[in-house]
Amino acid sequence: MPDPRPLPDEPLPIDLLNTELIASGRRVDLLADVDGLRTWLEAVGRPELPASPAGLAALHEARAAVRGVLEDAGDDAARRRLNAVLDRGRRREELGDAGPASVVEVRDEADRLAWEAASALLQLLRTDRHRLRACDGHDCVLWFHDTSRSGRRQWCSMATCGNRAKARRHHARSKDGTAKG
Ligand SMILES: [Zn+2]
Protein backbone atom coordinates (compact mmCIF):
# COMPACT_ATOMS: atom_id res chain seq x y z
CA MET A 1 0.00 0.00 0.00
CA PRO A 2 1.56 3.37 -0.92
CA ASP A 3 1.75 5.98 1.83
CA PRO A 4 -1.47 8.01 1.50
CA ARG A 5 -0.25 10.88 3.67
CA PRO A 6 0.29 14.22 1.94
CA LEU A 7 3.26 15.07 4.21
CA PRO A 8 5.24 12.08 5.42
CA ASP A 9 7.58 13.76 7.92
CA GLU A 10 5.22 15.38 10.39
CA PRO A 11 4.72 14.45 14.07
CA LEU A 12 1.73 12.30 14.98
CA PRO A 13 -0.79 15.03 15.92
CA ILE A 14 -0.07 16.86 12.64
CA ASP A 15 -0.25 13.57 10.75
CA LEU A 16 -3.66 13.11 12.31
CA LEU A 17 -4.83 16.59 11.26
CA ASN A 18 -3.59 16.00 7.72
CA THR A 19 -5.85 13.00 7.28
CA GLU A 20 -8.36 15.65 6.21
CA LEU A 21 -7.09 17.07 2.95
CA ILE A 22 -8.06 18.32 -0.46
CA ALA A 23 -7.12 16.17 -3.44
CA SER A 24 -8.10 17.11 -6.99
CA GLY A 25 -10.36 19.81 -5.60
CA ARG A 26 -12.29 17.42 -3.37
CA ARG A 27 -12.25 17.05 0.39
CA VAL A 28 -10.85 13.66 1.31
CA ASP A 29 -10.75 11.93 4.68
CA LEU A 30 -8.05 9.27 4.94
CA LEU A 31 -9.85 8.07 8.07
CA ALA A 32 -13.24 7.74 6.44
CA ASP A 33 -13.50 4.04 7.30
CA VAL A 34 -11.68 1.13 8.92
CA ASP A 35 -9.86 0.27 5.68
CA GLY A 36 -8.52 3.79 5.52
CA LEU A 37 -7.47 3.52 9.15
CA ARG A 38 -5.58 0.28 8.48
CA THR A 39 -3.63 1.90 5.63
CA TRP A 40 -2.92 4.98 7.73
CA LEU A 41 -1.73 2.91 10.73
CA GLU A 42 0.78 1.24 8.44
CA ALA A 43 1.87 4.60 7.07
CA VAL A 44 2.52 6.04 10.54
CA GLY A 45 4.47 2.92 11.51
CA ARG A 46 1.90 1.38 13.85
CA PRO A 47 0.62 -1.63 11.92
CA GLU A 48 0.39 -3.62 15.17
CA LEU A 49 -2.58 -1.54 16.36
CA PRO A 50 -6.01 -2.93 15.58
CA ALA A 51 -8.03 -1.06 12.95
CA SER A 52 -11.41 -1.04 14.66
CA PRO A 53 -14.51 1.18 14.51
CA ALA A 54 -13.80 2.19 18.12
CA GLY A 55 -10.23 3.16 17.25
CA LEU A 56 -11.52 5.16 14.30
CA ALA A 57 -14.02 7.01 16.50
CA ALA A 58 -11.30 7.77 19.07
CA LEU A 59 -9.05 9.22 16.37
CA HIS A 60 -11.87 11.31 14.92
CA GLU A 61 -12.46 12.76 18.36
CA ALA A 62 -8.77 13.44 18.93
CA ARG A 63 -8.47 15.00 15.49
CA ALA A 64 -11.32 17.41 16.13
CA ALA A 65 -9.81 18.33 19.49
CA VAL A 66 -6.32 18.90 18.05
CA ARG A 67 -7.77 21.03 15.26
CA GLY A 68 -9.87 23.06 17.66
CA VAL A 69 -6.95 23.75 19.98
CA LEU A 70 -4.60 24.74 17.16
CA GLU A 71 -7.09 26.86 15.25
CA ASP A 72 -8.15 28.82 18.31
CA ALA A 73 -5.99 28.69 21.42
CA GLY A 74 -8.82 30.31 23.40
CA ASP A 75 -11.40 27.67 22.48
CA ASP A 76 -12.37 26.21 25.87
CA ALA A 77 -14.61 23.53 24.34
CA ALA A 78 -11.70 22.26 22.22
CA ARG A 79 -9.45 22.27 25.27
CA ARG A 80 -12.01 20.20 27.18
CA ARG A 81 -12.27 17.79 24.26
CA LEU A 82 -8.51 17.36 24.21
CA ASN A 83 -8.45 16.82 27.97
CA ALA A 84 -11.19 14.22 27.65
CA VAL A 85 -8.97 12.28 25.25
CA LEU A 86 -5.98 12.66 27.60
CA ASP A 87 -8.07 11.45 30.51
CA ARG A 88 -8.28 7.99 28.93
CA GLY A 89 -4.65 7.15 29.43
CA ARG A 90 -1.42 7.98 31.17
CA ARG A 91 2.29 7.49 30.81
CA ARG A 92 3.89 5.43 33.52
CA GLU A 93 7.64 5.65 34.11
CA GLU A 94 9.55 2.63 35.29
CA LEU A 95 12.97 1.10 35.40
CA GLY A 96 12.58 -2.02 33.33
CA ASP A 97 15.05 -4.89 32.93
CA ALA A 98 16.33 -3.14 29.77
CA GLY A 99 16.65 0.23 31.50
CA PRO A 100 14.37 3.25 31.96
CA ALA A 101 11.06 2.80 30.19
CA SER A 102 7.93 4.79 29.75
CA VAL A 103 4.76 2.82 29.28
CA VAL A 104 1.53 4.22 27.91
CA GLU A 105 -1.46 2.79 29.73
CA VAL A 106 -4.94 3.21 28.31
CA ARG A 107 -8.22 2.00 29.73
CA ASP A 108 -9.30 0.83 26.29
CA GLU A 109 -6.82 -0.25 23.61
CA ALA A 110 -8.92 1.57 21.00
CA ASP A 111 -7.84 4.87 22.60
CA ARG A 112 -4.09 4.24 22.42
CA LEU A 113 -3.09 6.20 19.34
CA ALA A 114 -5.60 8.97 19.99
CA TRP A 115 -4.07 9.38 23.45
CA GLU A 116 -0.54 9.34 22.05
CA ALA A 117 -1.47 12.01 19.50
CA ALA A 118 -3.00 14.24 22.18
CA SER A 119 -0.02 13.74 24.47
CA ALA A 120 2.44 14.49 21.64
CA LEU A 121 0.48 17.67 20.93
CA LEU A 122 1.02 18.82 24.53
CA GLN A 123 4.74 18.27 24.11
CA LEU A 124 4.75 20.36 20.93
CA LEU A 125 2.68 23.09 22.57
CA ARG A 126 5.24 23.29 25.36
CA THR A 127 8.19 23.88 23.10
CA ASP A 128 7.06 24.81 19.60
CA ARG A 129 3.59 26.32 19.64
CA HIS A 130 4.43 29.06 17.12
CA ARG A 131 5.98 26.49 14.80
CA LEU A 132 2.75 24.57 14.37
CA ARG A 133 1.11 26.31 11.44
CA ALA A 134 -1.38 25.90 8.64
CA CYS A 135 -0.01 26.09 5.11
CA ASP A 136 -0.38 29.54 3.51
CA GLY A 137 -1.37 27.89 0.24
CA HIS A 138 -4.55 28.97 -1.43
CA ASP A 139 -7.20 26.31 -0.71
CA CYS A 140 -4.70 24.16 1.19
CA VAL A 141 -5.85 22.69 4.50
CA LEU A 142 -2.60 21.01 5.56
CA TRP A 143 -0.66 21.75 8.72
CA PHE A 144 3.02 21.35 9.44
CA HIS A 145 5.58 21.54 12.22
CA ASP A 146 8.17 24.06 11.08
CA THR A 147 11.55 22.57 11.93
CA SER A 148 13.47 24.91 9.63
CA ARG A 149 16.28 26.92 11.19
CA SER A 150 14.69 30.25 10.28
CA GLY A 151 11.25 29.19 11.48
CA ARG A 152 9.72 30.86 8.43
CA ARG A 153 8.34 27.91 6.56
CA GLN A 154 5.16 29.02 4.79
CA TRP A 155 4.12 26.03 2.75
CA CYS A 156 3.25 22.41 3.33
CA SER A 157 5.53 21.72 0.40
CA MET A 158 7.58 23.90 -1.92
CA ALA A 159 6.79 21.52 -4.78
CA THR A 160 3.06 22.17 -4.59
CA CYS A 161 1.81 25.19 -2.64
CA GLY A 162 5.15 27.03 -2.72
CA ASN A 163 5.43 26.83 -6.49
CA ARG A 164 1.80 27.73 -7.05
CA ALA A 165 2.25 30.85 -4.95
CA LYS A 166 5.39 31.77 -6.87
CA ALA A 167 3.57 31.28 -10.17
CA ARG A 168 0.68 33.44 -8.97
CA ARG A 169 3.04 36.22 -7.92
CA HIS A 170 4.81 36.01 -11.26
CA HIS A 171 1.47 36.09 -13.10
CA ALA A 172 0.37 39.14 -11.08
CA ARG A 173 3.65 40.91 -11.88
CA SER A 174 3.50 40.26 -15.60
CA LYS A 175 -0.11 41.45 -15.73
CA ASP A 176 1.06 44.60 -13.94
CA GLY A 177 3.79 45.09 -16.53
CA THR A 178 1.30 44.81 -19.41
CA ALA A 179 -1.00 47.38 -17.84
CA LYS A 180 1.84 49.86 -17.40
CA GLY A 181 3.63 49.20 -20.71
ZN1 LIG B 1 -0.15 23.59 1.19
Regions found by a protein language model. Give the residues of each.
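Basic DNA-binding region of bZIP-type proteins
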Residues: 159-178
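Short helix-coil boundary/hinge micro-motifs
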Residues: 1-134, 138-142, 178-181
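Short linker/helix segments within small regulatory modules
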Residues: 146-153
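Residues immediately within or flanking Cys/His clusters that coordinate Zn2+
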Residues: 130-137, 153, 158, 164
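Residue-level signal for short amphipathic helical patches enriched in basic/charged
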Residues: 73, 147, 162
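Short amphipathic alpha-helical interaction/hinge segments
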Residues: 93-94, 148, 169
